[in-house]
From Swiss-Prot:
Lineage: Eukaryota, Fungi, Dikarya, Ascomycota, Saccharomycotina
Protein name according to UniProt: Nucleus-vacuole junction protein 2
The encoding gene: NVJ2
Further remarks about this protein from its record: Present with 36500 molecules/cell in log phase SD medium.
Deletion phenotype: Leads to abnormal cellular complex sphingolipid levels. Simultaneous knockout of SVF1 to leads to myriocin sensitivity (sphingosine biosynthesis inhibitor).
Phosphoserine, modified sites: 640, 669, 717, 720, 723
Organism per entry: Saccharomyces cerevisiae (strain ATCC 204508 / S288c) (Baker's yeast)
Membrane topology annotation: Single-pass type II membrane protein
Stretches in topological domain Lumenal: 27-770
């Protein structure tokens, strides 16, 4: 019975609890599955994000972004240790540059300056006994006589409640603090002051230090820390001193000692909050270990980094040093504000205001540099690929106008936009134009790859509002395309011109007097060149006019003089013309005038003789009319010849006679042997070679002169005159008929002496044989 009761109890209880237990089990399984699914989804999202930059994120994946390894290794307080040779004094010894300024401002004579210079403590007065082997440990600076292991301790300087600074802190005039470039130079030293001597201006945060008069007489020991410790009085005076000055031979060692002394003056138990406390104002801004490892991995990631590894390492190291400072934040903030002011926002968004800037974790990387152009004029073009994945984040505030329709009132909502630049890469072009350009122009050669992550925040909660994010993304891409893609370029000024008359260029030094002298010299040179050119042109023009007058004087001789004399005279005239032209080219005015004067006299006399002969021998009107027509035609020909001669170069050869320009009588109807009794005695063979010319009715004299091949003889002027004197009826008849013809002058410059030779041959045949 007992077993039956137990069975019934178990059965009843099991039936009641079975369904709840099953439901509870299913619920637990569902929760476990949901947790596993969400975990796998997060891991998948994390892996997807890491795939974007898997190579650069692989080693730095599990490191805390804020971890700084150097901060853990830094030695502070009593743990600081350093040693080396230094020179220590209780009084400040002035540098030679400071002494020169002091003497200049003293306004004394030379004797007073010499005496004053002897009173001032100078660096050249430092002695060997002031040089010690210093050991920094346990928060104290121990000074030894030498660096041996058993060296005697001379002095010990406690660094607790001490202010360490670079001295002098101000320039030679004592008005402005030294620039950072002059802190670690031969002029400066390290000063150790007691905190009681130093104060700080709470308003401007300026350090107020004790003032030292260079004319103050030195102490009894001249500021020395003597190695002779026999007198207790001197030891007491030394330990009660409030300042020490440390001089170093090496400026780089001076920097190391400066940082070590500051760290040694730190006290971990100090509760002070003043700015003079090194625990407050002298905490080193160590680099983030994750960012430093990422930089090391980036510059060794690909083959393209080999040529620019040094550049990327330098830029990355400088970026990480400024990453936590306000200087870089302000610089980027200013640049972004200028760019945002140029962006046209959508109609439903107000102006964009930058509230916060996070510079990211890395600097841009530059790869594949290429020199495209470097000209002698100075034009320079450099192409390089740039890649940025530093996660620069900007918080922008604006207002959005939300319109939900006519039934609802339009509302304005304040927005905060978180814009993160995940990637910004492309081929970059740098351009430096020839002088006077003073800036570097840069732009992307093609549209860069841009990956923005924009998240609007309303009432401190993130919203997924695609209309706003897409509009802002498109506006950012449009702004980049319109300002940083070729042909649109931005610039970096490397030489500012705030005080220049003409801004935006590199000009030569301004010297108005020198510029005026240069312009005067250039104007005088141009004037001399112009006057010389005009003088030469005038001489050439005078020579051409002289040559024209000579040619005009030659015309009557060609008409009236004997052909042979005319040729000789023309040769002389041409030679004279040539000599005159050459003389003109060489600017010999005297010789040119003499030659032209002689030529004019010679031809003037010749023309007078020709005129007298013309009056005596030519009397009929028909000849005069014909000669007038010939003169008119000759004048036209001469004018055209003068025009051609002005265009063509001057020829120096003798002119050729084309026509004898004299009247030719009609051919008699009787045979030629009956014209004169001189021909009766000729043999028959002498006249066989002279065929009977055609009659006058068939051929006139002009055709006879024009057809040179058929012309075999001519009548000279002497024969015609003899015929007239002898009373030849045929010649007189021809004289009365006045049948005359002339051949017009051609444009040839050479004289064809064929006619002259034929006349000579004909005269020889007509002469009687003795």
């Amino acid at each position: 019975m007992a077993s039956l009761k137990v069975f019934l109890a178990v059965y009843l209880l099991g039936g009641i609890t079975f369904l709840p237990l099953v439901l509870f089990t299913l619920y637990k399984i569902h929760l476990l599955y949901s947790n596993l699914k969400s975990a796998s989804k997060k891991e998948l999202d994390h892996d997807t994000a890491d795939e974007i930059d898997e190579k650069t994120r692989l080693l730095a994946r599990d490191i805390d972004p804020e971890f700084k390894a150097r901060k853990l290794e830094e030695q502070l307080g009593v743990k600081v240790f350093n040693k080396g040779w230094i020179t220590v004094t209780k009084q400040y010894y002035y540098h030679s540059s400071e002494v020169a300024v002091i003497l200049k401002n003293s306004n004394n004579n030379k004797d007073s300056d010499t005496a004053l210079q002897e009173q001032i403590l100078q660096r050249t007065d430092l002695k060997k006994k002031q040089r010690f082997f210093a050991v920094l440990r346990h928060g104290n600076l121990f000074l030894y006589k030498d660096d041996s292991q058993n060296a005697n301790l001379v002095h010990a300087i406690s660094l607790q409640n001490r202010f360490i600074t670079i001295w002098p802190r101000f320039d030679e005039l004592g008005k402005e603090e030294l620039p950072d470039a002059s802190l670690f130079t031969k002029r400066t030293c390290i000063a150790i002051f007691k905190n009681d001597l130093v104060s700080i201006d709470s308003k401007n945060h300026n350090v107020i230090l004790p003032h030292f008069d260079p004319l103050t007489s030195a102490e009894s020991n001249n500021g020395d820390i003597s190695t002779n410790d026999t007198t207790h009085e001197y030891q007491s005076q030394f330990h009660s001193s409030n300042q020490f000055f440390l001089y170093f031979d090496n400026n780089m060692d001076k920097e190391d000692w400066y940082y070590q002394l500051i760290n040694a003056s730190k006290n971990s138990n100090s509760l002070s909050t003043g700015l003079l406390d090194p625990n407050v104002s002298a905490n080193a801004a160590h680099l983030k270990t994750k960012d430093m490892l990422q930089l090391i991995q980036d510059i060794n990631s690909t083959e393209n980094q080999l040529t620019t590894k040094w550049l990327n390492a330098l830029l990355g190291r400088l970026f990480l040093s400024l990453q936590q400072t306000d200087t870089l934040n302000k610089f980027i903030h200013e640049k972004i504000c200028k760019k945002l002011n140029k962006i046209k926002t959508p109609g439903f968004l107000d102006d964009l205001v930058v509230e916060k800037v996070d510079v990211g974790d890395s600097a841009p990387l530059f790869t594949s540099p290429e020199l495209l152009e470097l000209s002698p004029e100075g034009s320079t073009k450099i192409a390089i690929d740039v890649q940025y994945r530093g996660n620069l984040t900007i918080i922008i505030a604006t207002k959005a106008s939300i319109n939900l329709g006519s039934r609802f009132k339009q509302r304005e909502v304040s927005l905060q936009l978180s814009i993160k630049i995940k990637e910004f890469s492309g081929p970059l072009l740098f351009l430096i134009k020839p002088p006077p350009s003073n800036r570097i122009w840069y732009a992307f050669r093609t549209e860069p790859i841009m990956d923005f992550e924009i998240e609007p925040i309303v009432s401190s909660s993130k919203l997924s509002y695609n209309v706003v994010t897409n509009a802002i993304k498109s506006k950012f891409a449009e702004a980049v395309k319109e300002s940083l893609v070729v042909p649109f370029m931005d610039d970096i000024v490397f030489y500012p011109t705030p005080n220049e008359v003409y801004r935006g260029g590199i000009w030569e030094e301004q010297d108005p007097e020198a510029a005026a002298r240069a312009r005067t010299a250039a104007a005088a040179s141009d004037m001399n060149n112009t006057s010389a050119k005009e003088h030469l042109e005038a001489l050439q023009e005078g020579g051409m006019k002289t040559q024209s007058r000579i040619k005009k004087a030659l015309r009557p001789e060609r008409k009236k003089e004997n052909l042979k004399d005319l040729v000789d005279a023309s040769g002389v005239a041409t030679k004279t013309t040539t000599q005159t032209t050459v003389t003109t080219a060489t600017n010999d005015d005297v010789s040119s005038s003499e030659n032209s004067t002689k030529s004019r006299k010679y031809f003037k006399n010749s023309i007078k003789k020709i005129g007298r002969w013309y009056k005596d021998n030519v009397g009929n009107s028909s000849d005069t009319e014909d000669m007038d027509e010939i003169d008119v035609q000759d004048k036209k020909n001469d004018d055209s010849a003068d025009e051609r001669e002005s265009d063509n170069p001057i020829l120096t050869s003798n002119p050729k006679m084309i026509s004898n320009r004299r009247p030719v009588p009609r051919r008699p109807s009787q045979p030629l042997n009956t014209l004169s009794p001189k021909l009766e005695g000729r043999k028959e063979k002498d006249t066989e070679n002279f065929p009977v010319p055609p009659s006058a009715s068939n051929m006139n004299a002009s055709k006879m002169f024009a057809n040179k091949e058929n012309r075999k003889f001519s009548v000279s002027s002497n024969d015609s005159q003899n015929s007239l004197k002898n009373g030849d009826p045929h010649v007189k008849a021809s004289k009365l008929e006045s049948s005359q013809a002339f051949v017009k002058k051609t444009s040839q410059n050479r004289f064809n002496d064929g006619f002259f030779k034929q006349d000579l041959e004909f005269e020889e045949q007509r002469e009687p044989k003795l």
